Amino acid sequence: MMKDYYTWTYPDIPEDVAQKLQQLKNSLVVVGIVGRSKCDQANKMQAFGMEPPIEHTAKDGQVQCYYKPGTSSLLLHFETTYDEAILGQMIDVCMEDVDTPFDFDSFYERMRCRFVRMMLLALHACHIVVYVETGPTFDPTLVTVFQLLKFAREQHLMQFLPQMLRETPAARMSEKTRLCAPRILFLFENFPRDEPKTRECVSAYEFQTEDCIYELLRHHTIVTNSSSTSLVALPNNKQFVFFNAHEQLHEDKLLKAIECLNQAMYKPDAKEEEEDLEILELAPFDGFVKPYNLPVDEKELEKQQYKKDHTVWHFLQRHVQDALLGCFDEGSFKQHSQHGQFQLLNIQEWHDYMATLHKLLVENAKDPNHETSNEEYKLFLKCFDESLNYEKKFWTHLCELGLKKGIAAYKNAAPANYGSATHRQLLADATVAFEEEGRGPQAKAALAKLAAICQKYWQDGRQQCEQLSLRSHPCTLPKNLPHEKHNSAVIHISSCNCGRTQGRREDPFSMRQANYEFYEHIAQMCNLCVKVKHYKFPVFEPSVSDYRAAAFEAAFPLLHTAKSGARQGEEGDDEPEDEVVQEQQQPVEEQRQNTASNGCSQPLSPTFGSDLNMSIAGFGASLNESQASSEQLSNSEQNTSSSGTSSADTENELVVELQEPAKKETREDAGPADALPTSTTEYLPGLVHTVSNFGLLPLFPSWSLACVGPSSIYSHNTGLQEHFQSGFLSGANFLLPWDVQLRLVHAPKQQHHTHHQQQHPGKKQQRWKKQGDRLSLKIFVGMEYECSRGHRFMMCAPDRVLRGGADIERDTCSKVVHNNMPLYYPCPCRSQTSYLAQLMRIHVVTPKAPVNIIVDPKVCVGKEKYTFTLGSIVPPRLSQSAYWIIRLPYIYQGDDVIIAPPEKLEPDDPLAGGYLLPGMFGVAETDATQDLNEPGRMGASAAEDFTRI
């Protein structure tokens, strides 16, 4: 099919077309086609009955020219970023750049700037501009584009274009810089589907849209009364909006072919008259010689004529005629000068002018290395895109306001010195203040800037030291100022070693401050602490001035010390092999008994006051009970059972063997037989635990063991009085009674000597005989917990706080001494904040009997499950008929790690923070020759001759 028009890509105009255009002389009207399209070739000319060549490829900034011979109009088809084909190309390029994330805001700004650049070219190179819209409604964002076009023309183009046009073949256009105030027309390719497509409805819809567009353009001064100040022109008495209501554009060719086939096959019946029925009977078949269509009436003819006349081409030619007749400005503006802006050029003049504009506005902008002497034009090339991004300027302005508000909110609320937690809270408040004003794409960068400014302000002499205390509280002193001691401004209430005096203590930052210095300081203010007898724990005694802390492997501290302990055990293991063989040949039942009694005895029966048959448990010469002590224990059990003292009546008795007392002089000469050598150059940095090196001692004692008075100072009827033990909660100030039944048995090898003593008995042995070989002990025990507010209370079970005397039952104490007692427990005090109380003291009231109570508490703490001990090779003996208090460490430390208390306890696992192991009490025969306050003067026999309760 021959086309009745020519098409080419600018600037490659064919010679034959150029000759035909030359014949028009100064009657050439240039029409620009811009807007939106949906087809692959970005074609907006289909409504004009034109299309590009099949091999045509759409490109951004490309101009396709169309000319129909016999007319005076040259149509320029501008391919812009508003065409879907070109928009898709831009998106593909952005997606290929995997290093840069896709930013919609910057992409939209870049797309709009390119469209504005092409629109500037169209408004200066054309007399008429047709804006094509694929939808049935006007896009209000086009008003924003017109505003940007007016800004760009007045602020940029008019600054350099007149001067630069004088230096080109288009010098004729240097004064006016454009052909005219171009008349803007609007083409809507689709009509609303729900509206009837009659002449009246289409015209009414076109008039309604014209009124809307006119009001918008007049309101934003896009169209004015003067052609010199107006960006575009609108005709006063002519239609400038066209709706394509009858022709389907961009239709599916397959569906069109199917529809044509259906119409060809369908023949509707015509209305036959009665007289024609005889003629129709002669027809060879039905439908013979019947017309294909119904007869058309006058209304149908009028409708078809309207469809024929209502075309885009006729719509455009009415405005082209205004341009040819020279009444272009008169038909658009009320005010116009005698020498109006409108002018017609021949093809050569227009081509020179178009080439200059295209180079200045499009080509040079694509070359970042373009050099020019015109400063205004240089500014245009450099800042054109940035100057059009008014949204970015708007969002930037809002973010600046929000930034000022956020900074002011931060600085006004900031104290003189504050820590990171306060800084984060102030920054959060500043962010809220910022968000009251700051919005848009720049908000994220502005928030980062706000955080940086606030961070710098905080670190500029206002930052706290924030060294964490052992209770996980930060130091509040200024970081940039030197300070000898840290201070977290957190005050705790704690009691002294004896529990009589309570005082305020600062949050500790060192183990020495936590476990030693505070108690030494408050002891000076306590009337009781300075009088009581204290057990002396072994501590490090340096022999050089440059002593240091022992080094441990950071990753495996327990493994290192365990290996060293194992090596020492191997070196000290010199038992003959025949003893090992003899042990293996023991009956199975006896081996089970030995295993059960290896270092710990059987627990007491929960029945109050019952007799128990407990085996003698030697603690050994070290904290890791050696195999030798275990074998000695087995031998002693065999001797006990073979002596014939066991019977059916005494199976549940606690057996204590009475040893023959040695001479005092002999024991003093012997000294500590099993004393281990200790280091005098390296000390243990933490607390003593079960796998720590035996030769390392701590710098200071973290435990305290003191006798605060005789047993008579405690009355079970009134409990602990406030003048003696202050700070106890009501009803939680009672100790738990514990009855233990003993059976005294003489050692087999001393029976002859004992028989000799019976013939010449002393007073002490005479009192024993009067009491028989059984002895009932009444011990009072209390597990005291203390919270940071100074509240103290006893517990009657691992999960129950003592509420008064009614909570004390027959087996209450057994629940405490024979179960794991939690190291931390919620304080029952009434407070909005839940405080954790810590096991701080163990109260023991010893009986008035010829035996000593042995204490050996072990506390299991931490993820590595350190088991901390008193650190004494020989467990302490408590004197008879006395009130003893064991004060536990305030803070626990392993080899190289501080074990901080938990923030809260899980209800299903109260022992997660740590616990006191059961079996800490033992009983042994009283030995008057031993000094209970001097552990170094106690022999190895003291560690062996007692029974664990």
From Swiss-Prot:
Keyword hit for Cytoplasm: no
Regions of compositional bias (Basic residues) in chain numbering: 749-768
Biased composition (Polar residues): 594-607
A Pfam family assignment: Smg8_Smg9
Biased composition (Low complexity): 624-648
Region Disordered, residue ranges: 564-607, 624-652, 748-768
GO biological process, alphabetically ordered: nuclear-transcribed mRNA catabolic process, nonsense-mediated decay
Compositionally biased spans, kind Acidic residues: 571-581
Keyword vocabulary terms for this entry: Nonsense-mediated mRNA decay
InterPro entries: SMG8-like
Intrachain S-S bonds: none
Keyword Iron-sulfur: no
Protein family: Belongs to the SMG8 family.
Role description: Involved in nonsense-mediated decay (NMD) of mRNAs containing premature stop codons. Probable component of kinase complex containing nonC and recruited to stalled ribosomes.
The protein, known as: Nonsense-mediated mRNA decay factor SMG8
Organism listed in the record: Drosophila erecta (Fruit fly)
